[in-house]
Amino acid sequence: MAEKPKKSQKLRARLPRGLADRGPAELAATRAMVETIRAVYERYGFEPVETPAFEFTDALGKFLPDQDRPNEGVFSFQDDDEQWISLRYDLTAPLARYVAENFDSLPKPYRSYRNGYVYRNEKPGPGRFRQFMQFDADTVGSASPAADAEMCMMAADAMEALGIPRGSYVVKVNNRKVLDGVMESIGLGGEENAGRRLTVLRAIDKLDRLGIEGVKLLLGEGRWDGGEQGKGDFTIGAQLSPETSTPILNYLDLGIRVARDRVESPNRELGIVGYLEQIVSGSETGAQGTTELAQIVRLVEAAGYDDGRIRIDPSVVRGLEYYTGPVYEVELLLDTKDEKGRPVRFGSVGGGGRYDGLVSRFRGEPVPATGFSIGVSRLQAALTLLGKLDTRPQAGPVVVTVFDRDRVADYQKMVARLRAENIRAELYLGNPKNMGNQLKYADKRNSPCVIIQGSDEKNDPDGAQIIVKDLVLGAELASLEKDREEYLQKQAEAQRKVPEADLVDEVRRILAKHSVRWS
C-alpha cells in the first residue's frame, strides 16, 4: 500500500530572542523623540551624517564589546573575499572610519550627529536587547575641554526638551585618566595590560547594578549571575589579588561617598576634584585627569549649569576602552513601577566621552574627538513607564467605503480629493459585500470617520449626497445609555448627510472637532 503523502508543516512564526516588533504608536513616539533630540543637536550647530549598518570588522578593531573572536559580542560574517564584516555595535566606531576616509574634505573641528540601530551579540535578558536605537553627537578635531563641557550641557538640554524636569536627571562626569592613575599605581599601566584593564573597567561599569561587593567579585576570580555558587552563568573576573584590587575599591567607595555627601567647600564640584587630586597624587596621568575635570566644571558653571544638572561622579568609567579622557553618563533619578508593580530604577540612559585614539588608528597622527550618545530605545521605555510619552494609538485614515461594486472609480475619486487636501484617506480594498465588516475595519484602523455613498445618495433629487459617520462620536454613544436626550442628539451628529461637494469641508470639521493631527 502506498504511503500517504506527509502534510507539509507550517512554519512557526517567531522572533529570535532579544528582538522586538514595534507598532504604529510606539514608532510615532520614537519619531517624536528623535525629532526633539535632533532639534537640540542642531541648535548646538551639529549636522547630520549617516553611515552603513555594516563595517569591516577591523574598522571596529580591538574595541569590540567582547574580545578574541570577530563574532564575539558582535554579529559578523565573512564576505566572498574572506574579509570579516560586522554589524555596528555603536555609532562611534563607524564615525571614526568615516572621518578618516573623508578627512581632507571635512571642516575641522567636525561636528556631526547620527541616529540609527546598533546590534549586540550578547545574552538577551530583561531590558537587554540585541537591536536598539542610539542618537549620537560628536566633535572630531578639538582637544579643548570646552568640547567635553558642551557635550554635557547638550545632554542636559536634551533631557529637558524631552520633558524630564531638572532634579529628575543628572549628567555625571568623570575622567578615565583619574582611574588610569589608580591602575598605574597597582601595576596595570601599559599596553601589555590592556586586556586586564578593560576587564577592570567593565567590572567598575557594573557598580550601579551590582554594588561594591559585586564589583569586588568581578575584580577577583569572577561572579555567578545568580548571586550564589553554581547559580546562573559565571563571568570570569580580572584575577586581581585582594591587595591589588583594594586601591580600586577604596577609590570607588570613597568616591561614591564624596559624590553623595556635601563637601565642606564653597564649590562642591571643585571640592571633589581636590579630593581626587589627593588619590592620584604622584601620577602624571591622574593629575591631567583632575585638571581637565576642573576645567569642565568651571565651563559648565559659567554657562549656568549647576551641580543639580551636571556633577562630578568618580564611579563613572564607561565600559569601552577607547575612551581616553573625560567620560559622562546621563542618569534618570526617577523611580517607578513596571507593568507587574515591581519597582524600577532606570539608571543610565546615555553616555559618552573623549576618544582621542579612535580616528588616529586610521590616520597615524593625533586626532582628538569627543562624543555623546542617547540610548533612544532605553530612554523611550523609561519615558513610557513614567507617562511622559503619548502611547495612544494614532488616528487612522478616513475610510471611504464601497457600497456599489461597479462604482469603485467614483469612490477612488473621493479618496483622491481628500489626499489632495493633505487628509489621510484610503479606499476599502477588502470584500465589499458586507458594510458591517467595512465599518469594523475602520474601527480597527482607528479612523476618525467613514464615507458612505449608495445609489440613493448618488441619485438624490437635490444632487449627489454622502453619509459621513463620525466614529469618535459614535464610540462615545455607548456611555450615554442613561441620558436619552443627549444620546439622540449625539446620534444625529454622529451620522450626517451632506452634499458630495462638501466632502472635504465636512471631514475637516470632524478632524478639527476631535483635534485629529497626524504627525
From Swiss-Prot:
Keywords: Aminoacyl-tRNA synthetase, ATP-binding, Cytoplasm, Ligase, Nucleotide-binding, Protein biosynthesis. Its EC number is 6.1.1.21. The keyword Aminoacyl-tRNA synthetase applies. One of its GO terms (biological process) is histidyl-tRNA aminoacylation. It is found in: Cytoplasm. It holds the Pfam family HGTP_anticodon. One of its GO terms (cellular component) is cytoplasm. GO terms for molecular function: ATP binding; histidine-tRNA ligase activity. It catalyses: tRNA(His) + L-histidine + ATP = L-histidyl-tRNA(His) + AMP + diphosphate + H(+). InterPro entries: aa-tRNA-synth_II, aa-tRNA-synth_II/BPL/LPL, Anticodon-bd, Anticodon-bd_dom_sf, His-tRNA-ligase, HisRS-like_core, HisRS/HisZ. It comes from the Bacteria. Homodimer. Belongs to the class-II aminoacyl-tRNA synthetase family. NCBIfam families: hisS. This is Histidine--tRNA ligase. It comes from Rhodopseudomonas palustris (strain BisB18).
